[in-house]
A protein has these predicted regions:
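Conserved catalytic core of the tyrosine transesterase superfamily
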Residues: 1-226
């Protein structure tokens, strides 16, 4: 048979090797505490900044979910917060006592500012964290900048810190504390538990580090050091 060029590409249907999923970067509890302390000591918008950070670490929300929260979700000293996630799916996330306290304190100041704005003819904002920008609420980019400022003030490497690393820290610390994957999946709003399972690998790596650092038999003997 005479050889000719094929009209189609026979390899187009062949799938290439999949990329290995990178483990999410996270923070330890000491680093999270430093970030929270830095927010509490903010020179401007201290109550708002404290509320943002406490809610983020207490719930593991995505940054867009956090900054766009409606103020109605925060009324009545809630023990659970209704969050609207990807695809408009709603979920309830529990609030820790520090997060509830930070939220209550912030609402007092926020409502006072809103009352003053209304007296000047401005409409009330439906958002928990209002802004004069086009969206009407604090942008994710502004919060990204804020969290970097908290990192610098708290002595944590800014390269390690993003709103998403706080979400990772929330999940990893819960898992280390004994929470089950299904509960963490629900709180994070993951559609598939396989997405949540990656945190078990993060925890495995952290446990290995702790063993190598603290276990007496993991340290080199005197003869090995010589």
């Amino acid at each position: 048979f005479e050889e000719t060029w094929r009209a189609d590409n026979p390899v187009i249907q062949i799938k290439g090797p999949g990329r290995a999923k990178r483990l999410p970067k996270t923070l330890d509890i000491v680093e999270v505490d430093r970030l929270l302390d830095a927010a509490r000591q903010s020179k401007r918008d201290r109550l708002r900044n404290t509320c943002l950070m406490e809610l983020l670490y207490a719930t593991g929300m995505r940054v867009t979910e956090l900054v766009s929260l409606p103020v109605s979700a925060a009324r009545g000293d809630p023990r659970m917060l209704l969050v609207r996630g990807k695809g408009g799916k709603e979920r309830l996330v529990p609030l820790s006592p520090p997060a509830r306290a930070a939220l209550a304190a912030y609402l007092v100041g926020r409502d006072a500012a809103e009352d003053a704005a209304r007296k000047n003819g401005n409409a009330a904002s439906p958002f928990l964290f209002p802004s004069r920008g086009k969206l009407g609420y604090l942008t994710r980019h502004r919060f990204f900048g804020l969290i970097k400022e908290f990192a610098v003030a708290g002595g944590v490497s800014p390269a390690k810190v993003t709103p998403h690393t706080l979400r990772h820290a929330f999940a990893t610390h819960l898992l280390a504390g004994g929470a089950d994957l299904m509960s963490i999946q629900t709180m994070l709003g993951h559609a598939d538990v396989a997405t949540t399972e990656i945190y078990t690998h993060v925890l495995d790596d952290r446990l290995k580090e702790l063993v190598l650092e603290h276990h007496p038999l993991a340290k080199p003997s005197k003869t090995e050091r010589q």
